[in-house]
Swiss-Prot record:
UniProt KW Endoplasmic reticulum keyword: no
Protein name: Small ribosomal subunit protein eS8
InterPro entries hit by this protein: Ribosomal_eS8, Ribosomal_eS8_CS, Ribosomal_protein_eS8_arc, Ribosomal_Se8/biogenesis_NSA2
Family: Belongs to the eukaryotic ribosomal protein eS8 family.
Compositional bias segments (type: Basic residues): 1-23
One Gene Ontology biological process: translation
Gene for this chain: rps8e
Keywords attached to this entry: Ribonucleoprotein, Ribosomal protein
Subunit structure: Part of the 30S ribosomal subunit.
Species whose genome carries this gene: Methanococcoides burtonii (strain DSM 6242 / NBRC 107633 / OCM 468 / ACE-M)
CDD domains recorded: Ribosomal_S8e
Length: 125
């Protein structure tokens, strides 16, 4: 768990007087870091009794061809480019905006695999 609330220090380094303590809703979680491998999902409970599906590993993607609007299920071979972090390419981590090599060709990921539990992508011409 990671605290995502306000810092307890000023920009000068001095401590702020806190009117209250930390709250559970201010906690975040570690990133999913979706890898290219056999499918592995994890359900995470969220606010209001809902749930999020964390995609930990995936080897298929829903790839849409923008020219004709058709969507096919295609196998993911590797991660080609990732603007979020250059080291993610080496580790084959899929995030939104990363370019993956599929059987249909190179595609840009449009979904958030760690939040949505699925890899959706659009073919790059």
């Amino acid at each position: 768990m990671q605290f995502q609330g306000r810092s307890r220090r000023k920009y000068t380094g001095a401590k702020l007087k806190s009117a209250r303590g930390k709250r559970k809703f201010e906690l975040g979680r570690e990133p999913a870091a979706t890898h290219v491998n056999d499918t592995k999902r994890k359900n995470v409970p969220t606010h209001g009794g809902n749930r999020k599906v964390r995609l930990l590993q995936e080897n298929i993607a829903n790839v849409t061809n923008p020219a004709d609007g058709k969507t096919i299920v295609s196998a993911i071979e590797t991660v080609v480019d990732n603007a979020a972090n250059a080291h993610y390419v080496r580790r084959n981590i899929i995030t939104k905006g990363s370019v993956i090599q599929t059987a249909a060709g190179n595609a840009r990921v449009t979904s958030r695999p760690g939040q949505d539990g699925v890899v959706n992508a659009i073919l790059i011409e």
